[in-house]
Regions:
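Blade/loop signatures of beta-propeller domains
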Residues: 15-42, 90-92, 191, 199-200, ...
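Blade-loop segments of beta-propeller domains
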Residues: 49, 53-56, 71-124, 131, ...
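Blade-level signature of beta-propeller repeat domains, shared across WD40, Kelch, NHL, RCC1
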Residues: 329-357
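Beta-rich, blade/repeat-based domains predominating
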Residues: 50-61, 106-124, 156, 162-179, ...
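Loop/turn-rich, solvent-exposed surfaces of beta-rich toroidal or solenoidal domains
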Residues: 230, 245, 265-322
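Beta-propeller blade signature
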Residues: 82-94, 141-150, 197-211, 299-312
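Short, conserved, GDST-rich strand-edge loop motifs in beta-rich repeat architectures
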Residues: 67-84, 133-136, 181-201, 283-302
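A short helix->beta-strand "capping" segment at the edge of beta-propeller domains
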Residues: 27-52, 97-104, 153-154, 315-326
Length: 357
């Protein structure tokens, strides 16, 4: 009996060791650990006033860009300021574009404002501009809806919170109070969440919200991150960061999403922006996620910006547009093209204004 007990203990220890060994290798593979960093620089300079990241950026057709800054205390990612987050606006048609802080009016606790993904919606009926902002006060997830009042004011209209919106990363607005949002994890506790990653459980999703209904619009995603919409409003794009893919869904009547395809990108990509003119898809990506989680200023996390041309076609083309080993820009999360210019935002570092010509 004692001998059998020893065998069982030894077998259990061996099984646990094997599982943790598998988990370590799996996480390293998903994180693209030790991946060779491609370098491709552009003519760029840092945007003034942006010192602690611009996690998401989006731009209107007239060149007015909105920036979400100061994300902190989120998923144990590095951050270097505990100050409340801020929103900025930037006129890309100005000869020297400079971010201007937006003044926020209304009943919103600015002391706990922690902005993440953003989206903008223009109501064609009266040209009103609505800004949707994912907010994480005290590590919660909610969506703030603002009306933009020229030229530097946001009027807070509404806070949206719902059990289905439990871990919102990004958002794409499709109406004045209507949006799709990604949940980037299933569990809030670290241990079970790591288990879902190790076991490749695709339990993340996209949620559709309107004042009339809230429901899952798409599931089966391992780690839903950035989300955006095609210029013709027909397709929704979702970045599955751990699968190193961009998932394409067709948007049908009744706000139903039907999976179409996935495009491999070979990187850990976050936010998605779409060129208003060409329809090209731009993504801010991480070359090696282990350098984010184990931040070392001597070996900083790099940045990669990629573009996908003809994403709906049978032969989409993925190209590297910018690459840096972290000594110019750390932890890129978003890239926004506009008439030969490019804005690049980051998780916690600075933001770049670049020329594509």
């Amino acid at each position: 009996m004692a001998a059998l007990k020893k065998v069982l203990i030894a077998a259990t220890v061996a099984a646990i060791a094997a599982f943790f060994g598998h988990a370590f290798l799996k996480i390293n593979r998903l994180s693209l650990a030790s991946r060779e960093m491609p370098v491709k620089h552009l003519k760029c300079h840092y945007l003034p006033n942006i010192e602690y990241g611009a996690e998401d950026i989006t731009v209107l057709k007239d060149g007015l860009a909105f920036l979400s800054t100061g994300l902190h205390d989120y998923l144990d990612m590095p951050s270097f300021s505990n100050e409340p987050g801020k929103m900025y606006v930037l006129d890309l048609l100005h000869p020297k574009p400079t971010p201007v802080e937006l003044q926020i009016k209304g009943e919103l606790d600015l002391n706990s404002f922690n902005p993440h993904g953003i989206s903008v919606y223009t109501d064609e009926a009266d040209d009103s501009i609505y800004l949707f902002v994912v907010n994480h006060p005290q590590r919660k997830s909610q969506v703030e809806i603002f009306r933009f009042v020229w030229d530097d004011t946001l009027v807070h209209l509404k806070t949206v919170a719902h059990p289905l919106l439990h871990s919102v990363n990004d958002i794409v607005a499709v109406g004045p109070e209507h949006f799709y949002a990604t949940n980037d994890r299933y569990f809030h506790n670290a241990a079970p969440q790591v288990l879902t990653v190790v076991l490749s459980l695709p339990w993340c999703n996209v949620v559709y919200y309107s004042p009339e209904e809230v429901r899952e619009a798409a599931g089966g995603i391992q780690s839903a991150n950035g989300i955006n919409i095609s210029p013709d409003k027909r397709y929704i794009y979702v970045s599955d960061v751990l699968d190193h893919e961009v998932d394409v869904f067709e948007r049908l009547d009744g706000e139903q999403l039907v999976y179409v395809k996935s495009v491999a990108v070979g990187r850990l990509c976050q936010n998605i922006e779409v060129d208003h003119v060409t329809g090209d898809v731009w993504l801010g990506c991480h070359p090696d996620a282990t350098k984010l989680s184990k931040f070392d200023p001597e070996e900083p996390p790099g940045s990669e910006i990629i573009k996908i041309k003809s994403i709906i076609s049978d032969q989409p083309v993925v190209t590297l547009e910018y690459g840096d080993d972290g000594h110019e820009l750390m932890g890129s999360t978003v890239a926004v093209p506009y008439e030969g210019k490019l804005l690049i935002g980051t998780l916690f570092h600075k933001a770049l204004y670049c020329s594509l010509k």
